[in-house]
Structures are given as structure tokens and as C-alpha cells.
UniProtKB/Swiss-Prot annotation:
This is ATP-dependent DNA helicase Q1. NCBIfam families: recQ_fam. Its EC number is 5.6.2.4. The keyword Hydrolase applies. It catalyses: Couples ATP hydrolysis with the unwinding of duplex DNA by translocating in the 3'-5' direction; ATP + H2O = ADP + phosphate + H(+); dATP + H2O = dADP + phosphate + H(+). The modification Phosphoserine is found at residues 597, 602, 634. Residues 609-619 have a biased composition (Basic and acidic residues). SMART domains: DEXDc, HELICc. Keywords: Acetylation, ATP-binding, DNA-binding, Helicase, Hydrolase, Isomerase, Metal-binding, Nucleotide-binding, Nucleus, Phosphoprotein, Zinc. It comes from Pongo abelii.
Length: 649
């Protein structure tokens, strides 16, 4: 009869092999998901091509984009003349001519084009080539003001109506809408105007009857759909326009929309058949990078200042912040260290916003430190860097905000600082949104990924097929020459669940910070669990592990609402039950090391030349002197943003 020790040894061997098999299953499952995603995208494209082919056989014009990329339509001569003599442009960008031809033919079209691709021209130019006026629906007054400023410089007659418009101005616009001799070509309104102003709708009817109202342009059309990243209820009322004015052609524009969102928007706008032109999401001149956000504020500012004084010396940029308070504090810190910076957020007085915008456009200010209120319609071509002080609330938002860099098609950098605490600051803000948390976790997954091409991650989100080799080492992950492996972190999850169960029994709620403290053997003694050994990993890597468990649903967020704030707590998630199976394994990708280590690399740029480093070192001298005084006054130690190599417990 076999001895107990021999049986135990065999059992351990089987358990070990089961863990290895579980890890292989997870790797294969990930690969399966990638292939399923590619299959879905390709199937949709084939279906779209077949539908376009069928539609082309029965329509007056072929519905494939290539068929509309022509200059032999009745309006083509006028279109070219307006392009060159009014807009002062010599040629169209990709999909602009196709979209213009479709809308000039009186057909409905949706255009999905990256930020900076020139969507505005696709309805502004046709407005000048058509009789009557085009009604433009925009979500933000600031966006309308930006566009009107540019149109005025080009000598194009355009105006807007909003709640602050004077009675005299409203009266003039209403008269121009039905005046057959009017030169007014573009009228900008917010969706609220359509939803709530019966007087304006009445005026539109009269203009339509007089054949003066010829086209509807819905900017940021993704706002129609509750599945979009920026859903606005008043956009749902826009369906009335096609019902009331069926002969006015409609063009919808967005930089960020999935197929699901576009289909939903089409239904909401009451469009039966619609062309959809989608430009590639790829901006080949943009370099994407994710950096570990230093926990120390002084370290963080040091990192940013070294970049601005080094690689971006004398170059224009934007720093996006989570809140108005962050925007103002970062601006003050940068100014104290000699950077010409200006804050921009929604609560600034209109004249202050205009001043900051004007000075930045004229390069009198090097950096705008802004909230998301800054950017829509911003058309500064030479923005060399966009830095995210905190991550965006969704992939769509990040794509749009980072896309404000490099509109001149020259190389530009998009650097995102990822910090654990930001997850919960943002989740508390988006908790009431329909898919807010889901979209945030997609963004967290993007930031946590240390190996996949950033463009591949974006492509998967926007339903595109992408070959990582086409990135040309224009993202941090594609620049790495490290090897990666999957580490088994199952026991960490079991320990965290023990801590959360004990807290639940004590009727205690644990914030993410309290959970980490308890795990590390710190904080209140009653929240610690006997038998849970504190891991020897640094705190920032424990944060990454908890974030991994959160987006994999082994943990979940719960919220408490107070009069002043929404507080996020962590609880046991729906997938935690899988741990009842002893063989179940949870793995996390880490950088492979020759030693038995758990190493999470902070991303480093690879595209910049050696001169960048020298420039940063050269220009950091003044910074160090100024920073030393600031740090001495605050009594804080400047430890620097370090790359860490972590020994696995």
C-alpha cells in the first residue's frame, strides 16, 4: 500500500499541473476572444459590402465610398471652387469628398472620422454650395463659438441661437430664415433649442415650406445613443427633424462611435437608410504612452516639468485634468517653476476663457491646463503633446482628447499618467451613467496592459481589425523588448476576500485604500485577518493587482452617497465564487525576469532621440533649484518617479 507521503506528493503534483492547465486555459481564452472579435469585425465588413452592393444596384448612384470619390457630379465644379477660394485649401482629406458628394446628392450620411480629420468641412462646404441654410446641432456653446470664429475669419455668413441670444438677434435670425435673398448659410443651435423652443420649430416649418431649409448637420452624433460615451437626453428629441422635414438631408458626424452606437443613433434620428463612412481610427503620427502616476505630488510635477522643459521646450501642448481644482493647482505649480501655463475649465468667466484660448493659439501661453471643457472644435495644428494628468473616463473620451495633438500630421506625443486612486475618483462621478462604470473599466484595462499594442487595444474597442506591426513602434508597448509571462496571483485574491468577509461581519466598509492597508498589515487592528500574510510587494504593485481583480469581477465597487460626495467601497465580486474550486487560477501578465520576481514596468518612450534626454538634463537644472526651495518649505522628500523591480512573496 502506498505511503501517505507518496500519495501527498502525487496530490501536490496533480494540483500543480491543474494550476498550469488553468493558466494555459486563460491564455487560450484570451486568444479566443481576440479571434472572435476579429471574426465579428470582418463579418460586419463583409455584410456591409454586400448590402452596399445590393443598394448600389437599385440606387441612382453606387453606394460604395469609392464611387463617391469623383469630381464629375453636377456640383463638382462649385465644390472645388469653394474649397480653394473660400476655405483656402488645395485638396480634400480622406473621406471628405465622398461625404460632401453624398450630402450634395440629398442623401443621409454618417461620418466617423478621427479628431482633427476635418469633419466640419463636410457640412460647411456643402452649405455654401446649396440654396438656403444648413441647421447645425452642436452639444456645446463653446464648440459653436469656436467654429463661428473660424467661419467669420473666412468671410462665411453663420450665426448661432442660444438662451443668451438677445431678442433683437433672435428676431433677425428668424427673418433671415425665410428671406430668399439672405446670405446666411449656417445656423448653429444646441439640441435643447429643438426640444424646447416651439417658436423656433415654427420658424423652421416656414423656412422648409419656402425651400430655405435644406440640410441638417448633427455634430457629435454619438450623443444620441445611451450607449455612447457622452449621452445627452435632448439629442433624443432630434428625431422630430426628419419626421417634420423629410426632404432636408441629414449628415451626422462623430470621432468616436461603435457600430452599436451608430445603429442606435440612426433609429433615434428616424433615418431609414443611411450611408456610413468610417475613416480609420489610426493617427500614425501620434505616439501613445502610459506612465505610472507618482503618488507624491512634487514627483509628479517634476516629471511633467522635465518633459516640458526638455523634449517639448518651446512647443505647444495641453494637460488634461480630472477636476477644476486639479486644473488650477497644476497651473499654479507649473507657473511657479517658470512654465507659461493657463487654466481652462467650465467655471471660468467667458472673457477669461477667450483670453486663455487666444494666448495659447498665439503661443503666448505654452500649455493649457484644462478639464474636458476645453477641446471640442479646438483647431490648433501644432500641438506637440497632450498629457493626461488623470486617465479619461472612457476610451472614446481619451481618443478624442489625445487626438487634439498633431493635427499638422507631424509627430506628437500622447502621455497618460495612470494612478490607482483615479479609478475611484472617476467611478464615483460616472456611477449614475448608463454604462459609465463599464467604459471606465475598459480604460483601466487599457492602462494596465503592459504588452499589447496601444493601437490594437483601440482598434478592438472601435470594431476595427489592426495589425500591430503597422504601429511602427509608435506606442510604448511596441517599443519594449521585454519578454512577458503570466504570474499566478490566486492566493492574493483569496486573502483579499478573507479581509472583506471579516469586514462585512464587523459591519465595516472598506475603501480601496483601507483594503490595501489591511492587506499590508497596517491600519485598524480589527480589520486585519489572522493567517493573511502581508505581501512584500510595494504598494503600487498591490494597487495594480487589486485593479486587475476589479476589472475581472473578483471584486466589485459599492457606493455610499452623502450630501457632499459619493464614496466608493470595495466588496466581494460575482466571480469570487469560482475560487471555491481549488484548481481555479487567476493570472496576471508581468515582465519576465531571470529571478523569481513580480515586475511591473513603467512605460518608457523609445521614439525620441538621445537629444531629448540631454535636453531634459540640461533644462532640469533651473527646475531643481526652484523645486528644492518648494520642497524645503513643504518638508517633503523628493524621491523621484522610480522604476521598481519587485520581489515576489
Amino acid at each position: 500500500m502506498a505511503s501517505v507521503s507518496a500519495l501527498t506528493e502525487e496530490l501536490d503534483s496533480i494540483t500543480s499541473e491543474l494550476h498550469a492547465v488553468e493558466i494555459q486555459i486563460q491564455e487560450l481564452t484570451e486568444r479566443q476572444e481576440e479571434l472572435i472579435q476579429k471574426k465579428k469585425v470582418l463579418t460586419k465588413k463583409i455584410k456591409q459590402c454586400l448590402e452596399d452592393s445590393d443598394a448600389g444596384a437599385s440606387n441612382e448612384y453606387d453606394s460604395s465610398p469609392a464611387a463617391w470619390n469623383k469630381e464629375d457630379f453636377p456640383w463638382s465644379g462649385k465644390v472645388k471652387d469653394v474649397l480653394q477660394n473660400v476655405f483656402k485649401l488645395q485638396k480634400f482629406r480622406p473621406l471628405q469628398l465622398e461625404t460632401i458628394n453624398v450630402t450634395m446628392a440629398g442623401k443621409e450620411v454618417f461620418l466617423v472620422m478621427p479628431t482633427g480629420g476635418g469633419k466640419g468641412l463636410c457640412y460647411q462646404l456643402p452649405a455654401l454650395c446649396s440654396d438656403g441654410f444648413t441647421l447645425v446641432i452642436c452639444p456645446l456653446i463653446s464648440l459653436m463659438e469656436d467654429q463661428l470664429m473660424v467661419l467669420k475669419q473666412l468671410g462665411i455668413s453663420a450665426t448661432m441661437l442660444n438662451a443668451s441670444s438677445s431678442k433683437e438677434h433672435v428676431k433677425w435670425v428668424h427673418a433671415e430664415m425665410v428671406n430668399k435673398n439672405s446670405e446666411l448659410k449656417l445656423i448653429y443651435v444646441t439640441p435643447e433649442k429643438i426640444a424646447k423652443s416651439k417658436m423656433f420649430m415654427s420658424r423652421l416649418e416656414k423656412a422648409y415650406e419656402a425651400r430655405r431649409f435644406t440640410r441638417i448637420a448633427v455634430d457629435e452624433v454619438h450623443c444620441c445613443s445611451q450607449w455612447g460615451h457622452d449621452f445627452r437626453p435632448d439629442y433624443k428629441a432630434l428625431g422630430i427633424l426628419k419626421r417634420q422635414f423629410p426632404n432636408a438631408s441629414l449628415i451626422g458626424l462623430t470621432a468616436t462611435a461603435t457600430n452599436h452606437v451608430l445603429t442606435d443613433a440612426q433609429k433615434i434620428l428616424c433615418i431609414e437608410k443611411c450611408f456610413t463612412f468610417t475613416a480609420s481610427f489610426n493617427r500614425p503620427n501620434l505616439y501613445y504612452e502610459v506612465r505610472q502616476k507618482p503618488s507624491n505630488t512634487e514627483d509628479f510635477i517634476e516629471d511633467i516639468v522635465k518633459l516640458i522643459n526638455g523634449r517639448y521646450k518651446g512647443q505647444s501642448g495641453i494637460i488634461y485634468c480630472f477636476s477644476q481644482k486639479d486644473s488650477e493647482q497644476v497651473t499654479v505649480s507649473l507657473r511657479n517653476l517658470g512654465i507659461h501655463a493657463g487654466a481652462y475649465h467650465a467655471n471660468l468667466e467667458p472673457e477669461d476663457k477667450t483670453t486663455v484660448h487666444r494666448k495659447w493659439s498665439a503661443n503666448e501661453i505654452q500649455v493649457v491646463v484644462a478639464t474636458v471643457a476645453f477641446g471640442m472644435g479646438i483647431d490648433k495644428p501644432d500641438v506637440r503633446f497632450v498629457i493626461h494628468h488623470s486617465m479619461s473616463k472612457s476610451m472614446e473620451n481619451y481618443y478624442q482628447e489625445s487626438g487634439r495633438a498633431g493635427r499638422d500630421d507631424m509627430k506628437a506625443d500622447c502621455i497618460l499618467y495612470y494612478g490607482f486612486g483615479d479609478i475611484f475618483r472617476i467611478s464615483s462621478m460616472v456611477v449614475m451613467e448608463n454604462v459609465g462604470q463599464q467604459k471606465l473599466y475598459e480604460m483601466v484595462s487599457y492602462c494596465q496592459n503592459i504588452s499589447k499594442c496601444r493601437r490594437l487595444l483601440m482598434a478592438q474597442h472601435f470594431d476595427e481589425v489592426w495589425n500591430s506591426e503597422a504601429c511602427n513602434k509608435m506606442c510604448d508597448n511596441c517599443c519594449k523588448d521585454s519578454a512577458f509571462e503570466r504570474k499566478n496571483i490566486t492566493e492574493y485574491c483569496r486573502d483579499l476576500i478573507k479581509i472583506l468577509k471579516q469586514a462585512e461581519e464587523l459591519n465595516e466598509k472598506l475603501t480601496p485604500l483601507k483594503l490595501i492597508d489591511s492587506w499590508m498589515g497596517k491600519g485598524a487592528a480589527k480589520l486585519r485577518v489572522a493567517g493573511v500574510v502581508a505581501p512584500t510587494l510595494p504598494r503600487e504593485d498591490l494597487e495594480k493587482i487589486i485593479a486587475h481583480f476589479l476589472i475581472q469581477q473578483y471584486l466589485k465597487e459599492d457606493y455610499s452617497f452623502t450630501a457632499y460626495a459619493t464614496i466608493s467601497y470595495l466588496k466581494i465580486g460575482p466571480k469570487a465564487n469560482l475560487l471555491n474550486n481549488e484548481a481555479h487560477a487567476i493570472t496576471m501578465q508581468v515582465t519576465k525576469s531571470t529571478q523569481n520576481s513580480f515586475r511591473v514596468e513603467s512605460s518608457q518612450t523609445c521614439h525620441s532621440e538621445q537629444g531629448d534626454k540631454k535636453m531634459e538634463e540640461k533644462n532640469s537644472g533651473n527646475f531643481q533649484k526652484k523645486a528644492a526651495n518648494m520642497l524645503q518649505q513643504s518638508g517633503s522628500k523628493n524621491t523621484g518617479a522610480k522604476k521598481r523591480k519587485i520581489d515576489d512573496a
